Structures are given as C-alpha cells and as structure tokens.
Amino acid sequence: MSLTRLNIEAFRNIQSAQLIPAPGINLIYGQNGSGKTSILEAIYFLGMGRSFRSHLSQRVINNDDDKLTLFATLNLARGDSKIGLRRFRSGETEVRIDGEKVKRLSTLAETLPIQVITPESFSLLFEGPKSRRQFIDWGAFHADPLFYGAWTNVRRVLKQRNQLLRNGSSYSNIQFWDQEFVRYAEQVTEIRNHYVDSLNELLKGIIGEFLPSVDVKVSFTRGWDSKTDFAELLENQYSRDLATGHTVSGPHKADLRLRVGTLPAQDALSRGQLKLLVCALRIAQGKLLKQQIDKHSIYLVDDLPSELDAQHRQLLLKQLTDTGAQVFVTAIDPAAIVDSLHTPPSRMFHVEQGRVTVIE
C-alpha cells in the first residue's frame, strides 16, 4: 500500500499543494517553518481525522480559510482507492472513501494505517500508560475485527458505571453494569494480550539490531491482578470506587511495561537509547501489521537528523527500507538523509513558505 497522489488545501501554511509520492523513501526538506512537517501532519490527519501536533484540529486550518481539504489516491492490492477529508472551522468533518460518505473516523484508520516517528512520539515511554495503551490498541484494532466493538462497549459501560459511582448508587444498581463491564473487559484484554505476544516475537530481533547490548523485557499488564476474578474484584472494590468516584481497576488501566533487568526502561536507558527503543516498537508494529493482514503501514518520520546520530540514522533508514513500506521523512539538510541511505531516495520534495517543489 502506498500514496500515489496527495492534495493539500488550506492546511496550516500550505495554501495549495499537490504531491505525487513514490513507493519507498520520500524525502521532504526545507527550513524550519517552511511547511515540511505540515505535509506529514496532513497525511496523518487524512488517516486519523486529527493532528499529531494539536488537540484543537481547527488550528490546522489556514487563517484565510473556513475549511481545509485533503485528498489522496491509495494504491492497494485490490486497486486504487480515493480518500477525501474536509474539516470546517466549526468542527464539522466530512469524509469520503471512493465517493461514499463515511460516518466513523475509525474507517479512515482502517483504510490508511500510519506509523509516526516524531519528537513528540517519544512520549510513548516518558508519559503515563495512556499513550502505551493507545499503541497496543492501534495494533489490536487492525489485527482483530472484534476489538473495536468490544473497546467501544468498554468505554460506554465504564462511563455509565463511573456516573453511578459519582451519584452514590448502591452496588445492586451497579451490578448489571458490572456484568457487562466484565464481559467486554475480558474480550478486550484477551485481544490485547494476544497482540502483545505476537509483537514480542518480532520486537526481540529489531531491538537486537538497535540495542545489541541491552536486554529489554516487554510485558502486558491488564489493569488488574491476572490471578483475581474481575467480577469479584469489582464487587470487593465497590466501596473504594464509591469513595473515589471512579473505577480504580480495569482495562482502562492496562499498560505496556518495558524493563531492563529490574528497572523500568525509562530509568535504565539513556534518552538516545529510549528513542531507538521507540523506533523499534514502531517498526515492529508495522511489520506485524503486514504479517497479520498483508497491509503496509505508511511511516511518517519528522526531523530525523536532530533526533538520532549518523550511525543510528543509517540503521533506522535501513530498517524502514527493508519493511517495503512507503516512508515520508523530513530534514532541514537533505544530505543528512541522503548520506544515510544505501540508495538515493525514491523522490525528493523541497518546501519553502508552504510551496512544494519536486526535485528531479
């Protein structure tokens, strides 16, 4: 799978641009503020319906316009597919895939799986468990068609349960919701656990390439003691949950644990090593997607030279090239990327003040 055409209108400082990307490595270079990262952001927006840089998606709309428009042609195994997205300043979003209106943004994610390696993506290890749950759930969503429905039901039931707790409801009023919660929580947990097991098999080899002298152990924690019956736990913790006004244990507390010896990886590794670990996680996830559903991710790699030294840039780019996936990578100086590749980039784009030029 690859993008063969990308149209961007009124997205940040890009008023209008059309790119014809190539399979393989697409290098986008330009000075800070030129708009090169905005191209990556536009691709992400088209696949996720939101930005990886701002929770307020209205901010990505060009100041002179009331809407942004993104359009892409995807080359898939079954043929070409066309995706269009329009976001209005009012917050309304309109999505079409092959001319048909799409109501759920999850359909975008299913159609256009994206992996991001940016300065912000390293928060996967530095922040709390939420970002690591999202990492697991991205893979589980693509790997198992039952996951999205179960995950949606977990969120729905958890919201209802927490509302009852805040209202001081008796356990007899909560018990029905607990039965639902247990059913969907166990389904979500089983899919997550299976996914992490599969990921681990690939991850070991990739971590060995990036960090050959480091033994990283990866494990999944479900959000409650695996030896404890979840229904019993919810009943036993009712008083505690009532006091706090929310559900203390459950799949919404799950985490991906990474350890070196007895220490969390965050405490045992240098910042540079942690960045390589995140790169390994992203590459493993993309490779697993290809194994499980025979679809490539599209990789968006922002400002690589400032994040990794020359040796590790070369290693990462080799790993990305070997996946066979389409990659978009940005840099201020194109030589920093070109010199790290064994073969020239498939295509190069120069960006200046929001204007994009292909370099022949």
Curated annotation (Swiss-Prot):
Pfam families: SMC_N. The keyword Ion transport does not apply. Its main location: cytoplasm. Keywords: ATP-binding, Cytoplasm, DNA damage, DNA repair, DNA replication, DNA-binding, Nucleotide-binding, SOS response. Coiled coil: none annotated. GO terms for cellular component: cytoplasm. It comes from the Bacteria. The RecF protein is involved in DNA metabolism; it is required for DNA replication and normal SOS inducibility. RecF binds preferentially to single-stranded, linear DNA. It also seems to bind ATP. HAMAP family: RecF. NCBIfam families: recf. This is DNA replication and repair protein RecF. The gene is recF.
